[in-house]
Amino acid sequence: MLDSKLLRTELDETAAKLARRGFTLDVENLRLLEEKRKSLQMMTEDLQAQRNARSKSIGQAKAQGNHEEAEKILAEVANLGSDLDDAKKALSELLDELQSITMMVPNLPDDSVPAGNDEDENVEISRWGEPKAYDFEVKDHVDLGEMAGGLDFASAVKISGSRFIVMKGQFARLHRAIAQFMLDLHTEEHGYTEMYVPYLVNADSLFGTGQLPKFGEDLFHTKPATEEGVGMSLIPTAEVPVTNMVRDTITDEADLPLKMTAHTPCFRSEAGSYGRDTRGLIRMHQFDKVELVQITKPEDSMAALEELTGHAEKVLQLLELPYRKVILCTGDMGFGAAKTYDLEVWVPAQNTYREISSCSNMQDFQARRMQARFRRKGEKKPELVHTLNGSGLAVGRTMVAIMENGQQADGRIEIPVVLRKYMQGATHIG
């Protein structure tokens, strides 16, 4: 959530920055609402002051034995009280309206983010590794998995529907090995604390990280949002429960940065992805991911973004998977992000790079929603932290890349060296 002061004192400048990411802020409506807010605020304060003064006069009149005057003033106070209640109600309703508008406004892009409308205008930063040249016809991961009997899409459709998977035998083990390797790397070498978190979260948590109210249709809910009562939602990413660890807390400066990682399933309705990536493991309703989260001081967050992205890159490098790093343009960034890097892994059967990790600096956007703060040494007033998150990595897509990049002419799949200790020493599957 943006600082409301920006919408009051720097409205035109804020609108211009939002326009860079394709968001049109209704400046005239906000300006009108702000004038109403000021007027109602002044009216409320004036009525409160009048009532306080009258109440004091009642006591003075009674002390002087002038009960008739006291009764007269008491009647005036009653009328003022009614007017004050009306003014407070009108102000509260107006503040709610302003809040509902603010909740739908995305984060401001950092000045270093390139301008652009969509993914076609993202800017490539670097590449690592060279795609292999194959002397046989390349198969995709679906064919490779079904040939070996390790990926069973038909059973998943029977059990649940489309965009689900059943894995068997060595393929299920490889999936587990990938996640275990990532967790070990991030906790043992990159300094993250492993977390086990709930997979069902409440609305406050989803509001805190920005999924609600704007993206409710992308979630799986335990009860429709229209029903009374508090429902729960399946997490779309571990970013939600892990980042919410600092909601409504004040962290000591000395304890920052906080670095946390979690391996969880993620659940997404893919409401806006009809017809996209309908084959295979690329876009699923349920998929596993190892998430990286950092909580930092404001002045440290941009350096932390570089570090966090580097941690995700290290996974790909150790798995010897060719990838490229891109910075997202203003029009392609997520709702809460100020700056985002995507890592895209080479997928041979598609002859292209596909996103496997998205690493973002949210700055204080989530922290303001969550009231996540820290206190500097020697200071009384706490400040908002900055929050960062990234995939380290998406397990299913990593498996796709391993299968397709490691495929052999006979249909077997070479296991990356760093995973073999998790696979009982096996060098190939399939």
Curated annotation (Swiss-Prot):
UniProt GO MF annotations: ATP binding; serine-tRNA ligase activity
Pfam families: Seryl_tRNA_N, tRNA-synt_2b
UniProt-annotated location(s): Cytoplasm
Major subcellular site: cytoplasm
Enzyme class: ligase
Catalytic activity: tRNA(Ser) + L-serine + ATP = L-seryl-tRNA(Ser) + AMP + diphosphate + H(+); tRNA(Sec) + L-serine + ATP = L-seryl-tRNA(Sec) + AMP + diphosphate + H(+)
Keyword ATP-binding: yes
Similarity section: Belongs to the class-II aminoacyl-tRNA synthetase family. Type-1 seryl-tRNA synthetase subfamily.
Described function: Catalyzes the attachment of serine to tRNA(Ser). Is also able to aminoacylate tRNA(Sec) with serine, to form the misacylated tRNA L-seryl-tRNA(Sec), which will be further converted into selenocysteinyl-tRNA(Sec).
Protein name: Serine--tRNA ligase
